[in-house]
């Protein structure tokens, strides 16, 4: 076994092609998982002085510090409330629009679809600043409504394009078969079309929820100091301290709900559901 650890012996044992594949895989794993492992290490380090490879002392000192902040619990609650509200409202407005774009042909349809890409085509800070000026005029600054609208603007591309692709992939013959069996258009939609399009809708919902949970710039600008979500609270606490462990602890706290949601919805998440959403027909 230990002889196989010799690089030269390993190279001759597996061959040149397999050896190169192993090296590329090792580099990829190091590149992908290295920062995550470093973050975990730093989060549980009571004392850590760069450039030391390992912490000088392990423990939960900085976890206690973070959970001792009064703003943490309220910011977590606000993050979940805003993310859920953003996801639900986006579905109410965007799913019908996605179905319309998938099933009907009308003048300006492609231009309308491309318009949903504009929010991701320009620097977000510039868009947020322009929207903030408009919100100030209508009294939406520092309100939940203003923050939710900002979060919805970021999610509209996913909530329209991905479900639209999912609806296009539902064959009309299946809907017509349900209609021939006596189902009404509404019943056909909820019993046939919607369940078959659910993988694409689930992926869009996931992107919307996670995007809302992680949105910081728009929340800080529109929410002012009144609305503190987790990313906003993280910025404030991290800037008040020079300890890098605080940032690592907050990063883990932000990752946990995202990882749990991805695990729950894993059966709906596939490359075809994601890639298919960015094809215009």
Predicted features, each with a name:
Residues 99, 144-180, 187-193, 204-208:
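Membrane-cytosol interface at the C-terminal ends of specific transmembrane alpha-helices
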Residues 44, 70-100, 185:
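Transmembrane alpha-helix signature in integral membrane proteins
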Residues 50-54, 60-61, 109-110, 122-155, ...:
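Membrane-interfacial helix termini and adjacent extracytoplasmic/periplasmic loops
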Residues 11-18, 60-70, 212-273, 281:
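Interhelical loop and adjacent transmembrane-helix boundary motif
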Residues 42, 47-50, 125, 129, ...:
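Non-cytoplasmic
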Residues 1-39, 255:
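N-terminal signal-anchor/first transmembrane alpha helix
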Residues 2, 34-70, 223-225, 272-281:
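Short membrane-interfacial helix/loop motifs at transmembrane-helix boundaries
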Residues 3-16, 84-116, 189, 267:
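Transmembrane-helix boundary motif in ABC transporter permease subunits
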